[in-house]
């Protein structure tokens, strides 16, 4: 979660240093090892923008969801396994429904944070002619005209409406069910050995 403590534009500059399509350090290293005629990655792309945004805002989801998993009563999953349910069915019918409020809250937090971010899109997206709502708002403001300010205000209101609609939908989805677990004693979360799936799940 170190990226949680680093300003987004600083991280964007770091990734730019690594994956710049012409002089990126990591790009040149991979190209030299594999004897490639051109750089393998282009940070000035939609994929590059999504990657950098993901690396910076996944800690929001990680902290929210991991904390909820620590507090979840493992006896529910144990009861499911004793009843003959497979691990996959236990996850689908017990773990995921219990985690849904935290997952929805984390998704909402990440969306709002990423959608309102300006630093990363301006550094990564702008050179590749990739516009986002925040970069367009700043572009309109820099026009300095009344029309530019009006367009910037319209986009800002649009972004706010989208965030509120998503908040309402998430509240509606979570509010349809009750997620209260009553337990008379403290519990310890189960530690699951992922084995060969550890690296894929981490990625």
Which stretches of residues belong to each language-model region?
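Short amphipathic alpha-helical coupling elements at transmembrane boundaries
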Residues: 1, 28-35, 74-82, 93, ...
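Membrane-water interface segments at the C-terminal ends of transmembrane alpha-helices
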Residues: 1-70, 98-119, 123-125, 152-171, ...
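Glycine-rich helix-loop "coupling/hinge" segments at transmembrane-helix boundaries
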Residues: 20, 119-146
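Loop-to-transmembrane helix entry/capping segments in MFS-fold secondary transporters
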Residues: 80, 149-152
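Juxtamembrane helix-boundary/capping and inter-helix hinge elements in multi-pass membrane proteins
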Residues: 70-75, 85-88, 126-129, 142-149
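Transmembrane alpha-helical segments of polytopic membrane transport and secretion proteins
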Residues: 171-203
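Glycine/proline-centered hinge or cleavage motifs at structural transition points of membrane proteins
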Residues: 83-85, 97
């Amino acid at each position: 979660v170190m990226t949680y403590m680093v300003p987004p534009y600083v991280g964007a500059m770091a990734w730019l240093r690594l994956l710049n399509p012409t002089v990126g350090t990591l790009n040149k290293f991979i190209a030299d090892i594999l004897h490639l005629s051109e750089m393998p990655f282009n940070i000035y792309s939609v994929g590059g923008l999504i990657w950098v945004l993901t690396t910076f805002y996944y800690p929001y989801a990680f902290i929210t969801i991991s904390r909820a998993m620590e507090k979840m009563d493992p006896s529910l999953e144990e009861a499911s396994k004793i009843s003959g349910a497979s691990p996959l069915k236990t996850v689908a019918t017990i773990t995921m429904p219990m985690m849904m409020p935290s997952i929805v809250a984390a998704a909402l937090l990440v969306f709002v944070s990423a959608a309102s971010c300006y630093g990363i899109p301006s550094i990564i997206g702008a050179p590749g002619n990739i516009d986002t709502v925040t970069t367009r708002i700043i572009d309109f403001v820099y026009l300095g005209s009344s029309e530019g300010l009006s367009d910037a205000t319209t986009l800002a209101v649009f972004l706010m409406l989208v965030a509120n609609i998503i908040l309402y939908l998430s509240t509606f989805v979570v509010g349809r069910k009750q997620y209260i677990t009553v337990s008379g004693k403290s519990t310890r979360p189960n530690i699951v050995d992922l084995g060969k799936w550890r690296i894929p799940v981490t990625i």
